[in-house]
Amino acid sequence: MKQIKRVLKILAAGLLLGILAICLVYLLPCGSLQKHASESLKNAGQEKLHPKILKTEGENPFLLEGYKGSSLDNYTDTLMITQAVYQSEEPFYKAAMLSERKNNGKDQPIESLREYLENLQSGEVVSYSRYWHGYLVVLKPLLAVMDYGKIRMLNLAAFLLIQVLLLIGFLKRKL
């Protein structure tokens, strides 16, 4: 019985922490997020050196041609960015729970994001509140200070750091 109570307390604490975290990032002003998302749509032609994103890369470009494991999912990334930059008219706590974004009615999230950033009034408001959008807890603050290309580079650096730390751990244990 003690074990069940402990698990329920941990679950409740996690739930409250998740709600608090998502509500806090919805307090961030969307101006800088929209500016950096807009920068991510520009600077075409530099993808090989510094991936700026989206419009010129398309929805699923390959880093290594023909190798499916190197495919980038710009389609989903764009949906996530659109979710992050949307300025809801609802209070922050309600906006955090509704998870709204603008959609142009077509199945083209890159165009939908571009249209929203060019004309903040265009498109219909779509809500996707089925699950907790925890990625926004990280994405919104990062997008407030850098564009998507830099976020990709930061992600790569974090991935490489984790790989090096794992390798060091394996070497220490002689595995």
Predicted features along the sequence, with ranges:
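Short hydrophobic alpha-helical membrane-embedded segments
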Residues: 129-133, 153-161
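Short extracytoplasmic/periplasmic juxtamembrane "stem" segments immediately C-terminal to an N-terminal membrane anchor
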Residues: 39-56
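Hydrophobic secretory-pathway targeting helix
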Residues: 1-38
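Interfacial juxtamembrane loops and adjacent helix segments
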Residues: 54-128
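Membrane-water interface at transmembrane helix exits
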Residues: 21, 25, 29, 139, ...
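Juxtamembrane segments of multi-pass membrane glycosylation machinery
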Residues: 138-155
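Transmembrane catalytic cores of multi-pass membrane glycosyltransferases
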Residues: 123-126, 131-140
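Transmembrane-helix motifs of polytopic, lipid-linked glycan transferases
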Residues: 157-175
